[in-house]
Amino acid sequence: MKSAEIREAFLRFFEEKGHTRVASSSLIPANDPTLLFTNAGMNQFKDCFLGLEKRAYTRATTSQKCVRAGGKHNDLENVGYTARHHTFFEMLGNFSFGDYFKRDAIHYAWEFLTGEKWLNLPKEKLWVTVYATDDEAYDIWTKEVGVPAERMVRIGDNKGAPYASDNFWAMGDTGPCGPCTEIFFDHGPDIWGGPPGSPEEDGDRYIEIWNNVFMQFNRTADGVMHPLPAPSVDTGMGLERVSAVLQHVHSNYEIDLFQNLLKASAEAIGCANDDAPSLKVVADHIRSCSFLIADGVLPSNEGRGYVLRRIIRRACRHGNKLGARGTFFHKIVAALVAEMGDAFPELKQQQAHIERVLKTEEEQFAKTLEQGLKILEQDLAELQGSVIPGNVVFKLYDTYGFPVDLTNDIARERELTIDEDGFEREMEAQRERARASSAFGMDYNSLVKVDGETRFLGYQGVSGAGQIVALFRDGQAVERLEEGEEGVVVLDQTPFYAESGGQVGDSGYLEAAGVRFDVRDTTKAGGAHLHHGVVAEGGLSVGAAVKAEVDASVRQATALNHSATHLLHAALRQVLGDHVQQKGSLVDSQRLRFDFSHFEAIKPEQLKALEDIVNAEIRRNTEVETEETDIDTAKAKGAMALFGEKYGDQVRVLSMGGDFSVELCGGTHVSRTGDIGLFKITSEGGVAAGVRRIEAVTGAAALAYLNGAEEQLKEAAGLVKGSRDNLLDKLGALLERNRSLEKELEQLKAKAASAAGDDLSAAAVDIKGAKVLAARLDGLDGKALLALVDQLKNKLGRAVILLGGELDGKVVLVAGVTQDLTGQLKAGELMKQAAAAVGGKGGGRPDMAQGGGTDAAKLDEALALAQRFVEQGL
């Protein structure tokens, strides 16, 4: 079976078992800052397992795209060198949220794997593990399914602590957890390795293909396991692994999904060895990089973009090892789209964008190699001893993308070595950070848990009545909040908008007779709206009725800005292109901030075009229309989804100007575009590689901004004794006068340096056929001394020059050696000695070097080193 057929068969099997087929979620986890990338099928259902979210179904099945790069499940450096490590993979899964449990999950797995209608794997090839004390699962396997005891393995706590086992899964130190049962395929005695639990289990003979996790306990901070009222099931089967089994190969790189990618990679690079580990690296990395970019990640120096950049550069480095010349990586995207574009349409839709991002990053990598060389030169100039420290090697590798083997080559040329152990310690520290980032990072038992949903009244107005259904103080549920206490109030219905989609939460107050609660912010937990604030008067009790009043002026100002972001988004796609994707936003009552994907600064004429388009839509004063519909219908209408937002089965579609702007949005907006009044961009800049940010104001704030700019123009005109009408002419004349004076100053400096050079050259002494000049020139900076050394080298011919001086209490040193002497004498070595004499450091090229220090009293001694340096070197 082909991989695509296996994927479809799995999903169809579980649909027939009453499961809802759910699309793969984005690789960027929605509203979950604790997780770097989606790395398991259960990630999108996390809130369902935690009891924070209720869905219309209790059974689900997915084929989830996953990335594991550097986290606890994967080491990036292993990819390409083992049969099964990948940065990107598909996880097939079936899930039960308080519906079926162990018996059904086990029978489903066995039926799909061994049923003649499905995968039809030989039963005698399958081994099963269970947690050591999970007698229930063991009995189901042996007594009901019929797996013989000799192919059953109980796995205990094999990781040094209670419940620390390959067969016990936990969401964190506390919270949902439970035993798991894993199914292994035996590739046969021709492959080395032993069954699970044996000393040889790390071999390739017995391969895990399916894991069923049974979440049946809630572990509290004291380590006690409490049975969950509604146990759940989370399963995962790697598509690549099961494809290898069904296609009778022992390496994932031999399956159909990879064969065309390996061929395309070899063609793009121009190499013939299609079994080289480096080629497998490239074929693997094009998948993770392309899917990450399609889901909105762009290369940068932090967070998700940083991981993407590392993967791209690793692919480029391995391509270069195979002989690639110029950019090649982006050329493989077409083959990936042909292989996986039908299953994941976002690849087809984003193909041009993905190729452009990869090509730009490849070109940038070539430049960073040059930057890395410069940084290495600086570090070598300060090096004491013959070993380059591990932290320096790691900095070059991690920050500048500088290959470790290249650092090693340079070190060898200079008779140096690198601290490999220190580098590995830095790498392990990074892996620990990645492992930490892959955990959920929260105490399940400290979460504010609210059953049910809050009915939102805010689309109809800014006030309404509600009943208190829950109160919280310091995250703990309470029956009452007293005057002066801070806490959270949950109502059965509310006009307060809860922060989401970039729009801040509403503020205002809740009141009843003799009671007032000042609402400072409103957030959401599951479907409940949480009103954060303080009891200003009286006390609040669960069950009490209150009147909820939103600050209308703040709500209206926020609505202007939110509606303007929709118009701006549409205008950006018109002016810059369809590759523009929203990367984030902040909308409050003061301004709007909109982050989006684009690869260069926006030109002034483009900014003007954006303002013109948005303001034209405002002047059209069209009605802002909303419609409740299902997600598929909304997408069919071309509605754009908000970056990082989770949507239910029913969504709210917001349209402006007919089809000018159509987006999914649950925020609060104006009634007509004319309500916005005026739109003015206040700034545009870059916030990360490939991500730009526009900030703008609307309505009264836009008018105030323009009035302020007018006042600044008047003040500037007054400073140059002009008016608004002739301000540009006045400024132009002033700048021209300044340039003229700067030119005169440079000419005077050049004359002074030339005169000084004539005087100094006469002071040079001859040592073994070389002119040696050491001189003190106080008050000159490094730039002036460099120019003077260049001039003296031309005047003296075969020469060694060391100039130094005191400037602002510090020592400045410059050394120069003419090219005909650099084979015997190096300026960098002379500088190291001279700088050390004044308590500093220095270094540079063989023909020119700079340095400095703090001990000006030793400057004359440092300059005297020049003659001894030449005498010893020649």
Swiss-Prot record:
Its cofactor is Zn(2+). GO terms for cellular component: cytosol. It is found in: Cytoplasm. GO terms for molecular function: alanine-tRNA ligase activity; aminoacyl-tRNA deacylase activity; ATP binding; tRNA binding; zinc ion binding. Its EC number is 6.1.1.7. PROSITE patterns: AA_TRNA_LIGASE_II_ALA. Belongs to the class-II aminoacyl-tRNA synthetase family. Consists of three domains; the N-terminal catalytic domain, the editing domain and the C-terminal C-Ala domain. The editing domain removes incorrectly charged amino acids, while the C-Ala domain, along with tRNA(Ala), serves as a bridge to cooperatively bring together the editing and aminoacylation centers thus stimulating deacylation of misacylated tRNAs. This is Alanine--tRNA ligase.
